[in-house]
């Protein structure tokens, strides 16, 4: 085990990680505070005691929808009737102290109720909205979280990751990219927004041609940049695998197979986005 010990020592030298985690009305926890050191940690307990809920809470310190991809409203602890009457805060929250390169940061995220007008039904509706704060300052872009902490997870539901559809694999790869490219989360979010917009334009049946072309051009530019970032991550992994041979498992070489990915073999991303 000396090789493993050496690698763990190298990781902990950087002194980066979660040193305090506080949950409020999160899943099965009314309140929870965990103090931790910068070291590998194993969480144990009975089935259903909330081990995965702690991991999910940590995953919300990174960009995205967490390791379960749950709806915001589903995360809040179900209150008993006697608490529901007295409860004035309808949301959940996760707060953490982060130590990164020997500097401390405060990260908080949670939900609050907001209201918007439904013009079709002529009424005001409330909805859950996620807010994020870094060092007590509210931020508008979740991608900012990537500057302070990155996380990768493999859950039992991902056991057939390489046997199922391509979308889960792309999502998993994108989360790996986030650790090296802070702008990648913003690019993927913008692409998904444009895709929904593009779909609605086509669905309407009376699309403005210039508007459609503009959206498609933006999607092409973002798509090429996303593919290029994924290729760079794959290249990093292949380099690591080549320099860290394993005596137990066979060697592997990773590749991305797709039209844009093949075009990037011979063309820069800027030109591919304009193709």
Give residue spans per PLM region.
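Pre-Walker A-like glycine/lysine-rich segment at the N-terminus of P-loop NTPase domains
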Residues: 1-60, 80-81
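Residues at or immediately flanking beta-strands
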Residues: 33, 72, 234, 251-253
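A short acidic, often aromatic-flanked loop/helix-cap motif at beta-alpha or helix-coil junctions
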Residues: 42, 115, 159-160, 259-264
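Regular, well-ordered alpha-helical segments
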Residues: 60-63, 200
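Nucleotide-state sensing region of NTPase/ATPase domains
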Residues: 65-168, 174-180, 184, 242
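An accessory alpha-helical subdomain
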Residues: 154, 158-248, 257-260
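Small-residue-rich helix-loop
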Residues: 245, 257-275
């Amino acid at each position: 085990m000396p090789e493993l010990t050496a690698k763990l020592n190298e990781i902990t030298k950087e002194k980066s990680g979660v040193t305090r985690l506080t949950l409020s009305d999160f899943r099965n926890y009314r309140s929870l505070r965990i103090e931790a050191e910068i070291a590998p940690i194993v969480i144990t307990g009975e089935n259903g005691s909330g081990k995965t809920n702690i991991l999910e809470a940590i995953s919300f310190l990174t960009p995205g929808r967490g390791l379960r991809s749950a709806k915001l409203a589903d995360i809040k602890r179900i209150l008993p009737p006697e608490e529901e009457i007295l409860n004035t805060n309808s949301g959940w929250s996760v707060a953490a102290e982060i130590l990164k390169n020997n500097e401390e940061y405060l990260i908080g995220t949670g939900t609050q109720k907001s209201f918007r007008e439904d013009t079709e039904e002529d009424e005001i509706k409330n909805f859950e909205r996620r807010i994020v704060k870094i060092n007590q300052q509210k931020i508008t872009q979740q991608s900012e979280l990537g500057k302070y902490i990155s996380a990768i997870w493999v859950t039992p539901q991902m056991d057939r990751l390489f046997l199922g559809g391509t979308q889960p694999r792309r999502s998993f790869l994108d989360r790996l990219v986030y650790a090296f490219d802070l702008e990648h989360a913003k690019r993927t979010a913008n692409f998904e927004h444009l895709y929904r917009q593009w779909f609605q334009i086509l669905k309407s049946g009376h699309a403005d041609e210039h508007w459609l072309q503009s959206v498609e051009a933006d999607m092409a530019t973002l798509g090429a940049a996303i593919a290029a970032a994924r290729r760079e991550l794959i290249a990093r992994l292949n380099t690591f695998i080549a320099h860290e041979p394993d005596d137990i498992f066979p060697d592997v070489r990773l590749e991305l197979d797709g039209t844009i990915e093949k075009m990037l073999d011979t063309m820069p991303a800027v030109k591919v986005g304009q193709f």
